[in-house]
Amino acid sequence: MLTLAAQPRDVSGPDRRPHAVVIGSGFGGLAAAVRLGARGYRVTVLERLEQWGGRARVHRRDGFTFDAGPTIVTAPFLFEELWRLCGREMRDDIALVPMLPFYRIRFEDGQSFAYSGDRAAMRAEVARFSPEDVPGYERFMAHSEAVCRVGFEELGHVPFGNLPSMLRIAPDLLRLSGHRSVYDVVARFIRNERLRTIFSFHPLLIGGNPFRASGIYCLIAHLERQWGVHFAMGGTGRLVEGLAGLIRGQGGTLRCGADVARIRVEGGSATGVVLAGGETIPADIVVSNADSAFTYGTLLGGATRRWNTRRLNRASSSMGLFVWYFGTRRKYPEVDHHTILMGPRYRGLLRDIFERKHLAEDFSLYLHRPTATDPLLAPPDCDAFYVLAPVPNLAGGQDWARLAEPFRQRIARALEDSVLPGLTGSLVTSFVTTPQDFADDFLSFRGSGFGLEPVLTQSAWFRPHNRSEDVANLFLVGAGTHPGAGLPGVLSSARVLDSVVPDACVPA
């Protein structure tokens, strides 16, 4: 349901609107705040860190600007809708630039694939690798479109609050191969092993193992082709700033350094929050954008809850992330905005990461060069980069205080030997984020990068619900609830609130 734009508020008297407290200022929390403000709530967003954005915060070092987390904007209409709820157009505040290609996928021997939304170009790329797989590729994309139509367009913003709602879609899940893994679905259409890798890697963008993630996530291929892959000029942080501006324009409040210690529950209902310093903030509803495991395991304290400690410990978490941010005193014009560098192993590496929780000697990498599109993110004649390696989450027991620098050096050597010659001698600034930082900064369970692993038994009804099963007037948004991680996922989780949160009733 698309709520109409809120009318300007009369600020001459006291604000009698019902109060909504949003815990966390990630994209899920910010989008929820905008939607609630548009529906008549007075909104307060509480962020424990010293800047907005959660995983989408911004690092500024030595004249370089680095987006900390999300860099790939798909389904931009989900952002545009938030601006329209406030009677504005996003294009007046944010410049989105389409990427062409979306990514360049590079294998160890130097063979590369330019992945884009151009149908003719994609057929030609597939034919370069395996001419006999072109018909299978076309059939796979038709399948992806069918899955996207149901899994994203029809169900992505629908709450799964009870078991019957899940049972109703079971026939669709079977018909669309939701019980198979993404890799298995791709392999039904495509025979060339490298092409199977190219068309099955997408679950890694939301923390999933292509060999275990539900085949429903094959929808990502069509989602990207339909709505494109974009970059926000100025960085993803510009989207965070834009949403914060919308919230303020609605009369909402954003507070940094506000560490929520617990959600106050009285008579089975959420009635506000208590900060670490002892301050109590009353609320009519509470929306948590915190990690769902932290919400249920810590913020609700001793409250009776279905997602109890034992259930949380049994759940499968997404992978961890090792991210190295660096700036160079030279430019690398031959490097695309988004590059995926595949290592020597695919299935074996993912087994090490997700099952064995072993930090392998080899790795696959995602390299982000935002200055390919926006040179102002670095000093003149310089480039800004971040490189991300999927790694085990903290269940693997790795000591990142000891392992981080040797691992970074191995990544640097791999980049220097492939796409960034002379890298070591060109570094101007350098720092890393590890799974331990995800646990410390974002209170992420097991230091995972994306919350729960996106497998079928942890999807839709099987995830923590958008409306708490245990506490009235408590709602969840973000990667840890339905529909899941990634920008389209967390923005859609806020969209679900339109169906489960009552409209504000303002006293006369």
Kindly give the residue locations of the regions a language model identified.
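Extreme N-terminal leader/targeting segments of oxidoreductases
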Residues: 1-21, 38-39, 455-462, 468, ...
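A conserved FAD-binding loop/helix module that cradles the flavin
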Residues: 70, 479-501
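N-terminal glycine-rich phosphate/pyrophosphate-binding loop and immediately adjacent elements
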Residues: 13-149
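Mid-domain catalytic core of redox enzymes
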Residues: 2, 16, 261-379
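Helical element adjacent to the flavin cofactor pocket in flavoenzyme catalytic cores
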Residues: 219-276
